[in-house]
A protein has these predicted regions:
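A general alpha-helical scaffold signature found inside nucleotide-binding enzyme cores
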Residues: 79, 83, 147-150
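Structural motif
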Residues: 63, 94-95
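Cap/lid segment of the alpha/beta-hydrolase catalytic domain
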Residues: 71-73, 89, 95-169
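Catalytic-loop region of hydrolases
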Residues: 1-82, 89
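Generic preference for hydrophobic/aromatic residues in regular secondary structure cores
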Residues: 9, 50, 137, 169-170
């Protein structure tokens, strides 16, 4: 699951399905060159989670909104989806959320210093995928945030691929 500011619409009741997939590949880590460009200095394997919410094929308008999950709380959250869910469903747009950052996958310190003892926040801080369900997410492998940009881009490229491997959007 993904944290949200509101419970969101009834996906099944509106002709949508929600599925999780593991996305794997090789990501590059970039450093800035003296002339302001980027240089891919090394690579590392990754396996992360993507969350796909899609309409029935007859409703699909061909558009996909992709969101980089926010991890400021120490867990994946989908702030953009919270605000646009109704419009996505109305228009027949698919949604893909990507666990792009290390904290969301493997855990770490939150950046907003949430209290974990207050009402409504218990269990929020540090609820990474591996922390929530170690068995389910045992195959996740995140090389670190320096690789996140290429992971995100690689997953989007794979989603756009209409040949070869089956797409989670199909």
């Amino acid at each position: 699951s993904v944290m949200s500011a509101s419970p969101g619409p009834d996906l099944a009741g509106r002709g949508y399905s929600e599925h999780e997939y593991a996305a794997s590949g090789i990501a590059r880590r970039f450093v800035e060159t003296p002339d302001g460009g980027l240089d891919g200095v090394d690579t590392a394997p990754f396996t992360t989670r993507i969350l796909v919410r899609r309409p029935d094929a007859a409703q699909f308008n061909g558009h996909v909104l992709v969101e980089w999950f926010n991890v400021s709380s120490g867990a994946d959250s989908a702030p953009e989806y919270t605000y646009v869910a109704e419009e996505l469903i109305r228009s027949g747009t698919a949604y893909v959320g990507i666990s792009a950052q290390y904290t969301g996958v493997a855990g770490g310190r939150d950046s907003v210093d949430l209290e974990t003892t207050g009402a409504g926040t218990a269990g929020v801080q540090g609820d990474s995928l591996e922390g929530k369900d170690p068995e389910r997410y045992a195959g996740m492998q995140h090389p670190g945030d320096a690789y996140s940009y290429d992971m995100f881009g690689s997953i989007i490229t794979a989603l756009r691929n209409t040949t070869g491997e089956p797409s989670p959007l199909a």
